[in-house]
Amino acid sequence: CSRDRPDVVLMDLIMPVMDGVEATRRIMAESPCAIVVVTADVARHTARVFDAMGYGALDAVDTPVVGGADMRTAAAPLLRKIRNIGWLIGRYGNRPALTPVDKPSPKPSSQRLLVIGASAGGPATLAQLLRDVPLDFPAGIVLVQHVDASFAAGMADWLNDQVLLPVRLVREGERPLPGQILLAGTDDHLHLLADGTLRYTEDPKESLYRPSIDVFFHSVAQHWRGTAVGVLLTGCLLYTSPSPRDRQK
């Protein structure tokens, strides 16, 4: 990496001389570059995956199965993550700018909500951002991370070891309240409903990213009755919103 810096390193976790976690640590300490963990059965190695992400790996995905009936489908998750990282590091140029819109007027309520969306590179950044959030933080916190459902629970456990507030997966029908951090935990989209509860839904089905940060942020802008702050740490092109106005909210 130091002599000929690659665009992306595909890093296995299980290697004979040095495992992927240590290799990631050394690369990021000496010659930082984009790293994606690509290993057989990511769900079985969740703790190690997030250890690698803690050192700077940007994402993780199961190794595509070679020789299957549909190679294109098998390779799609890996190719999608590589493309997403290409946008993140500027390999594919600048993203289209969103059309500026007027900010909506605050709604009269004492309820506060912080929503954070992240994609490639998100776990390590989330840990750093949330590490010093105090136990008496006066707002509910909801995270939407582009992460496969198979290791969402592992991410919640990993974050629990990094931050003060308890972290767990969103339960269907609950409300975001102060004193905890909720993480979207399925391959369906997370929505905030008009009654202030959280729900998982398949719609919109055409979304490339599930759960979609864009879909959740739009539902918060539409339904939250108090003060809400949305933070986009890293992300991908927002394919699913119906308009630039919705994207800006």
What is each stretch, according to the model?
Residues P242-K249:
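A short, hydrophobic C-terminal helix/tail in secreted or cell-surface proteins
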Residues R3, V8-L10, I14-S241:
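Conserved acid/base catalytic micro-environments in cytosolic active-site loops
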